[in-house]
Amino acid sequence: MAKAKSSVPAGHHTVTPHLIMNDASSALDWYGKALGAEILARAPGPDGKIMHAEIRVGSSIIMLNDEMGGGRSAKALGGSPASLWLYVDDCDALFKRAVAAGATVPPGPMGTPADQFWGDRCGGIVDPEGYTWTIATRKEDLTPAELDQRAQDFFKSFAASQK
């Protein structure tokens, strides 16, 4: 057995999301169909539950497994306080594909894709397991001064719309 060359496995980042699933096998299939995920690892236990799996979405790896050992899925908890942000070349196309595959669109301003003041176009989905994803495309690179001005303009407009 060779000693590890790095403390971070090849292809991983120093922070890697690890999602607990109600049905990891179905989630793996859905992430492939809806988000174009590539399955890198899939380790079912003797009972057929997924003990560990890894997928690549874009340039990032996400780990996942079925509920076990006290781990609870977003579905079991009624949602997740954490969300995932996915940058792609065409957020509108991937958004439509994910919705066609069974994602739901949350209510509010981060639902259907729209241009945002910080230079992204993005929209939100909730996957069948209950995890929220923002699907985004960077449209403009802003200077700090441009971003600050746009933020001020946005919040003034938002405050006026609430009266």
Task: Locate each region found by the language model.
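Short acidic-aromatic low-complexity motifs
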Residues: 21-25
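Vicinal oxygen chelate
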Residues: 2-18, 28-126, 135-163
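C-terminal catalytic core of tyrosine-transesterase DNA break-rejoin enzymes
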Residues: 129
